[in-house]
Curated annotation (Swiss-Prot):
The active site is at C98. Signal peptide: none annotated. This is tRNA 2-selenouridine synthase. It comes from the Bacteria. It is an enzyme of class 2 (transferase). It catalyses: 5-methylaminomethyl-2-thiouridine(34) in tRNA + selenophosphate + (2E)-geranyl diphosphate + H2O + H(+) = 5-methylaminomethyl-2-selenouridine(34) in tRNA + (2E)-thiogeraniol + phosphate + diphosphate; 5-methylaminomethyl-2-thiouridine(34) in tRNA + (2E)-geranyl diphosphate = 5-methylaminomethyl-S-(2E)-geranyl-thiouridine(34) in tRNA + diphosphate; 5-methylaminomethyl-S-(2E)-geranyl-thiouridine(34) in tRNA + selenophosphate + H(+) = 5-methylaminomethyl-2-(Se-phospho)selenouridine(34) in tRNA + (2E)-thiogeraniol; 5-methylaminomethyl-2-(Se-phospho)selenouridine(34) in tRNA + H2O = 5-methylaminomethyl-2-selenouridine(34) in tRNA + phosphate. Keywords: Selenium, Transferase. It comes from Shewanella halifaxensis (strain HAW-EB4). GO terms for biological process: tRNA wobble uridine modification. Monomer. Its EC number is 2.9.1.3. Belongs to the SelU family. The gene is selU.
Amino acid sequence: MSLNKVRASEYRRIFVNDHPIMDARAPVEFEKGAFPASVNHPLMEDEERKKVGTCYKERGQEAALKLGHSLVHGEIKQQRVDAWLDFFSKNPDGYLYCFRGGLRSQLTQQWLKEAGLDIPFIEGGYKAMRQFLIETIDDAPNMKPMLILSGITGSGKTDFLLKRKEAVDLEGLAHHRGSSFGRYHEPQPSQINFENALAVALLKHQDSAAKHLLLEDESYLIGRSALPQAFYTGMQAAGVLVLEESLDARLARLLNEYVHKMHSGYIQRLGEEAGFEAFAQYLAQSITGIKKRLGNKQHDEFQAIITNALNIQTSQNDTSAHLEWIELLLVKYYDPMYQYQIDKKADRVIFKGDHQAMHQWLDNH
C-alpha cells in the first residue's frame, strides 16, 4: 500500500507559506520545540508515550504497538480523532507529522482515513524538518550579503528595521531587546523555538526581492536566546551601518519603551495595583542586572532616583522624572559601552546617518 506523504523537497514551501501542520507528538516533545505554524494534537499523551517507549526497548515493536492500541482505544481514541478532524476541517490543506515520520504518522493517518479523511504526513517528521532549518541558518550568511545596523542605545534601530523589507527582526523573534532593560512582557521562546522561527524568517527573506539581509547589531545572546554560531560569525564579518540620533530623541524614545510601554503592558496583564508593582520590580531588577558594572555606590544612586520617579509618577501622574535616570544610564553606562564596541568595528563601517539618510542609502544600494 502506497502511503500519502509529503516529500522532503517540499519543506521550504511548507515553511515559507506557513502551511498548517498538525504535530502528532506528545505534549512534552512539542513543548521542547515546535514549528511556528504547527498545532499539537497528540496521538499519545506523555505518560502513554513513556510506557510505549519502555515497552519498545524491552519487548520490541510488535509488543509496543499492541500496548499503544490498548492505551488509546474506545472513547479516548475517539476524542483524539475528533480533535484531528476538527483541525483538518479548519485546515483542509494541512499536513501531519510525528518525530521521524514513522509509525505515529502512519497510525494517525490510518485513523483519519477510517474517519473519512486522507491526510498526507510529512516525510522525515520533526527531526528531518528541524535539521533542514538548522542548515538554513548555517547557510544564511552565504545566501545574501549581510548588513548590520548599529547605533547608540535609543537611536531607534528596531523602529527603523521594521520599516525595511531587507530586515529580519532578531529581537522580535527573541522577545527581548538585547539589553538589561530589554525584557518583553511575553516570555522568551525556548532556544529551539527561537532557532526555528529565525530559520523560517530567513527562508521567507531568501524568497523575497531584498538584495541584502539587514540585521540589528546584537551580541551572541539576546536575553537568553543564543544566536547560532555560524550565523553569528557571519554577522561579525558583515558591513556596518551606523544609525545616528539626537540625545533628546533618544531620551523620548527610551522613556516610551522603558516606562510608558512597560507600565501599560503590566497593567493590561495584571491590573492597576499589581501591574504597577510588577513595573517597579522590572525597573529595579534591570538596574540590579548591571550592578557589577555600575558599582555599589552608583547602583544605589540609580535605585534612589528610580524610586523617586515612581513616587512622582504615582502621586502626580507624571512620568517625566524618569528622564533623570534614563539620561544617567546613557551617559554612565550605555554610551561608553557602545563607543567601545563601535571602535572595534570601525574598519567595517560603510555608512553613517540619521533615519532619513539611512533609508535613502539603503534605497540606493
